[in-house]
């Protein structure tokens, strides 16, 4: 098992000034907008009102689905456009197009809070507040892994499961052929949320990003096997308050949180990333996701959805 220490701090390179809010939804969720996901030219937002709203790329409202009776924690979308959502009542639902009330089905219900979900192709990963990660394929449970600590954010790729709460990112290697067996591959100081991003190399994302333990700094580590999760850079205190949300793609990383800012970063494989600037959202950032044409979508505590561009 690899336990990584802290790298040298990287200073932030000069900021560009192209960041702006392109679109804002004309209506919002009742209460917080809690999560966003993008697929097939449509944006999906979940809220404290239990609804999933579906938007055009320009944030024109297409439809509203009554997905849950209570607060939606998170969403994930698989390669076929199946939308999974979890709520504070312990239920996980899913739906396929056409996205409407009658399409909502129950995957499972439990007494635990499913606070994190992730799709890798057709495989769904769910993580709960008791530290249990469950893998699903074709809506059938494959394995359960008891990782002990509450799962606030997770990702999965090939035989690796990435989980985090508030102190450490844990990378677990699934033992092939043994139900629920795993070994710890690496432990990295940091807290939620976590994100796999960067170019794909033999089916694996090049980078893993997550905040430091303060919650206000960002760090990026190598995710490819030969590099053993070595740090690329670390940016302490690049936000004034705790980071709640990150998203990214092959070239860019975006981060937002309680400071009501969304910030963009590029040149990710350099010794220090280059800042793309920031936008003032005007409300706490709860969730972000990448869309098409370098658009970034923001779910915030005022219930509204915004679209920002940095390029």
Please place each PLM-identified region on the residue numbering.
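WD40/WD-repeat beta-propeller blade N-cap
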Residues: 25-33, 65-73, 107-115, 145-151, ...
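A short helix->beta-strand "capping" segment at the edge of beta-propeller domains
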Residues: 6-30
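Short loop/turn segments that connect beta-strands within beta-propeller blades
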Residues: 56-60, 96-100, 137-140, 174-178, ...
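Short coil/turn segments within WD40 beta-propeller repeats
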Residues: 31-34, 49-53, 70-73, 89-93, ...
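Hydrophobic core register within WD40 beta-propeller blades
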Residues: 36, 75, 117, 154, ...
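Blade-level signature of beta-propeller repeat domains, shared across WD40, Kelch, NHL, RCC1
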Residues: 285-311
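Beta-strand-rich domains and repeat architectures in extracellular enzymes and scaffolds
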Residues: 25-50
